[in-house]
């Protein structure tokens, strides 16, 4: 176990600074243009990997900046019921980590703006360990992934993971929480690259009606300990949420509300016509959220 200030954490700052991925390039572009990023999440393989490919194309073409591909897992403790059900459907359709990596390869071969979209693999640590760290990092990098967020891996336990992923030019993204002290936020930021992901509230994922009152304070505290771009997720679902975040964060991550839209539309089947309709609905949602982010930037109270 390591404490804040140990040489381990300082040594990795230079490694992370050297990493250049589509993620860091995209955030640099957003900063230069004065735009807020939108990061949609979908569970890969829900309802099928072919459908996920169509959804990624629609999200990217609508203006998404980074896409999180969820790797389905049988025991998703950090997720609320919506994403838990999505994982169950994806596993039932036969989706594996290897299949998700193949999906990334297919995305990179598209004749679409999606071919250059920044992709984060959003996974529990167990599937990565089952594949083997070195094999996973090599396969993820070769497929065209840009970063990995292992939801249940702590900063203290991540040294080997970070070493191997950084060697394959993969960003390592970690979660900061409202309960994190300033020292803890600094520790998490120091082992992160690409961006720092702040969860807006404690508990599991899921769409909420309003943002927590203490969220601005959390953003200010995080700004005080890192120069990394900051994305906020968990409970973000409405344009109004994104508009508020436009004055505080560099990006908003939206997951459960999109996954719920996929679930509702495909519960009785997922024909090509259904997938097309879902793709159009997801694209419309992203365009609306991007516009809300632009409106929110006019209220920015903390410089990025």
Residue spans of the language-model regions?
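N-terminal amphipathic alpha-helix/helix-capping segment at the start of soluble metabolic enzymes
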Residues: 9-39, 104, 297
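Alpha/beta catalytic cores of nucleotide-metabolism and tRNA/nucleoside-modifying enzymes
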Residues: 15-18, 220-226, 237-304
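Active-site-adjacent beta->alpha loops and helix N-cap segments on the catalytic face
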Residues: 19-24, 75-81, 95-102, 129-133, ...
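Catalytic cores of alpha/beta
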Residues: 50-58, 181-189, 236-252
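Glycine-rich phosphate-binding active-site loops on the catalytic face of alpha/beta enzymes
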Residues: 67-74, 147-149, 154, 198-206, ...
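Alpha-helix-loop-beta-strand connector modules within alpha/beta enzyme cores
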Residues: 82-120, 163-173, 177, 215-228, ...
